[in-house]
A protein has these predicted regions:
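N-terminal secretory signal peptides that target proteins for export/translocation
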Residues: 1-11
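Bacterial N-terminal signal peptides
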Residues: 16-27
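Boundary at the C-terminal end of the N-terminal hydrophobic targeting segment
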Residues: 30-32
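Long, low-hydrophobicity ectodomains and other hydrophilic envelope-associated domains
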Residues: 34-203
Length: 203
């Protein structure tokens, strides 16, 4: 759910260009599926004006993206900023699928994972589906054309696994030269995170 009022966009700081090693794409509606190697499920709780709302989020991972894919995204963002990134993501094949309650979801074209002291972090960015009203009235919200999120998986205490989803965002560089999420609406907090490590070709 998106804010109706035209308030100032929120900004979430991200240190340096290392964020690009986590980038994820969702193209348009999901058409292709592959064998799942892992499935992560969570409940997303609204914050701010969405407080009290709860939706389900599922990320099916078929395979991890390569260092070559990461380099393409870094170069594309450097040359074309947020739109360059969106264009590059739209050309990549699907390596997963992201589903949200009430939608059929999106194909995911880039997924990256890094180890942490307690487990793993998986951060994703998807191409956001622009709504009819946004396109018809040519609203400013169309520039927030990514949906981003992250899972912090705790392998030692799974009850401490958390995450966040940013429904409408874009990537910008601030005055200090740092990469930031520029948020159109409040983030959603991920709770009750379940990590299902499946068998390729089976589940």
């Amino acid at each position: 759910m998106r804010h109706i009022k035209t308030a100032k966009a929120h900004k979430a700081p991200v240190v340096g260009f290392t964020l690009l090693c986590f980038l994820v794409l969702a193209s348009t509606f999901a058409l292709s599926r592959g064998p799942k190697t892992e499935t992560i499920e969570a409940s997303a709780m609204g914050t701010g004006t969405q407080l009290g709302a709860v939706i389900g989020v599922t990320l099916d991972i078929y395979e991890w993206s390569t260092p070559a894919d990461r380099q393409i995204l870094i170069e594309s963002f450097t040359k074309g900023q947020n739109q360059g990134l969106v264009n590059a993501l739209s050309k990549m094949k699907a390596v997963g699928h992201c589903s949200i309650t009430g939608t059929i979801g999106y194909d995911v074209s880039y997924i990256r994972m890094v180890p942490t002291p307690t487990g793993r972090k998986i951060v994703f960015v998807t191409n956001r589906l622009i709504r009819f009203g946004e396109a018809y009235f040519d609203t400013q919200s169309q520039s927030f054309n990514l949906t981003a999120g992250e899972f912090d998986l705790n392998d030692t205490d799974k009850s401490k696994s958390t995450g966040s989803v940013y429904p409408a965002t874009q990537l910008i560089i601030d005055k200090q030269g740092q990469l930031q999420y520029d948020l159109r609406e409040n983030p959603w907090k991920l709770v009750d995170v379940l990590d299902w490590k499946g068998t390729p070709g089976v589940n």
